[in-house]
Amino acid sequence: MGIFDWKHWIVILVVVVLVFGTKKLKNLGTDVGESIKGFRKAMNDDEKPAEPVVPPAAQPVPPVQPQQSAPLNQPHTIDVQAQKVEEPTRKDS
């Protein structure tokens, strides 16, 4: 006899089913199962040797030139349309 006897586990299981319902527990089990499958598949794919990557032919890269920016004294504007946001209605008032 430990802290949790089999009778305790039955009571806990009944309470969990009453609180969450069988549909949510089924969905939770399905989601956990799919996550485990995805994890195992990713682990198996990781063990397979990757295809060797062939480096592209060496081509000269032109030097990067800085872009011309607007003078600092001009204001920066964003051209978007404003949208009206309504306050949510409270149920208790």
Curated annotation (Swiss-Prot):
GO terms for cellular component: TAT protein transport complex. It is found in: Cell inner membrane. It is a single-pass membrane protein. The keyword Disulfide bond does not apply. Residues 52-65 have a biased composition (Pro residues). The Tat system comprises two distinct complexes: a TatABC complex, containing multiple copies of TatA, TatB and TatC subunits, and a separate TatA complex, containing only TatA subunits. Substrates initially bind to the TatABC complex, which probably triggers association of the separate TatA complex to form the active translocon. NCBIfam families: PRK00442.1, tatAE. This is Sec-independent protein translocase protein TatA.
